[in-house]
UniProtKB/Swiss-Prot annotation:
InterPro entries assigned: F420-Hydrogenase_large-U, Ni-dep_hyd_lsu_Ni_BS, NiFe-Hase_large
Co-factor(s): Ni(2+)
Entry similarity comment: Belongs to the [NiFe]/[NiFeSe] hydrogenase large subunit family.
Protein name: F420-non-reducing hydrogenase vhu subunit U
E.C. no: 1.12.99.-
Highest taxon listed in the record's lineage: Archaea
Note: The large subunit of Vhu is split into VhuA and VhuU. Each contributes two ligands to the [NiFeSe] center.
Species of origin: Methanopyrus kandleri (strain AV19 / DSM 6324 / JCM 9639 / NBRC 100938)
Length: 42
């Protein structure tokens, strides 16, 4: 699962650096990452 988290972190970085208007998408990614981390704890 760490690989998926790394990919999401990379996507988030790309989105934020590419266009500030896409920060909403980055916010969605944050929520997805939170869900993935919660699953890892189970």
């Amino acid at each position: 699962m760490a690989e998926k988290r790394d990919v999401l972190n990379y996507l988030e970085m790309v989105i934020r650096s590419y266009d500030i208007u896409l920060s909403c998408a980055a916010h969605v990614l944050d929520r997805v990452k939170f869900r993935i981390e919660r699953k890892d704890e189970d």
